[in-house]
Amino acid sequence: MKFLFDLFPIILFFIAYKFGGIYQATIVAMVATIVQILWVYYRHRKIDAMQWVSLIMIMVFGSLTIFLHDSTFILLKPTALYWLFSGVLFVSAQFFNKNWIQVLMGKQITLKPTHAHTVWHQLNLAWSAFFFFMGFLNLYIAFEYSEETWVNFKLFGSTGLLIAFVIAQGFWMSRHIEHPAE
C-alpha cells in the first residue's frame, strides 16, 4: 500500500498530462507532493529524509518549469533525484563507512553472519548502480523521444524497472538470508 501511496504524485502527473499538458501536470505533481507530505505528517507526525528530498526536488524543478515555461527542468528532475540517491549511497559507503541500504533494511533482514558485510556492501553498490543507470536512462528517454513517451516511461517504464530490480534483488538476497532454526 505504501508503494501505491508513493506513486500518488506520479499517477496524478500522468493523468494531468493526458488532459492538460506538461505545465498543468507539473503543477498537479507539485500540489500532490505537498498534500502527500502533509498527509504523512498528519498520520505519523514525522517525515523521512527521502520524502523531504523529493518535495524539495519537485518544488525546485517544478517551479523552474512553470516560471521559465521550459519543460526541460521537469524532464531533468528524475535524473537529478536518481543521481543524488546514487551518489549518497556510493559516497557514504566508500568514504564514510555508512551503508544506507543496510540501515534501511537491516532490521527486517538477517543475513548469514559469515559474509553479511560483503552482501550488504554488494547490495548497496547494486542500488547505487541502478540509480545511476536510471538517471542516464531518463536522460535518454527525455531527449531522444517525445514528451509523451517520456511521461509514459516515467510512470510505467521506471516503475516497472524498479519492480523488476527489487524482485531480482529478492532472489539474490534469498541465498544469503539466515533462516531461523526450527
From Swiss-Prot:
HAMAP family: YciB. InterPro entries: YciB. It is a multi-pass membrane protein. Pfam families: IspA (PF04279). Keywords: Cell inner membrane, Cell membrane, Membrane, Transmembrane, Transmembrane helix. This is Inner membrane-spanning protein YciB. The chain crosses the membrane at residues 20-42, 55-75, 76-96, 123-143, 153-173. Plays a role in cell envelope biogenesis, maintenance of cell envelope integrity and membrane homeostasis. It is found in: Cell inner membrane. The gene is yciB. Belongs to the YciB family. GO terms for cellular component: plasma membrane.
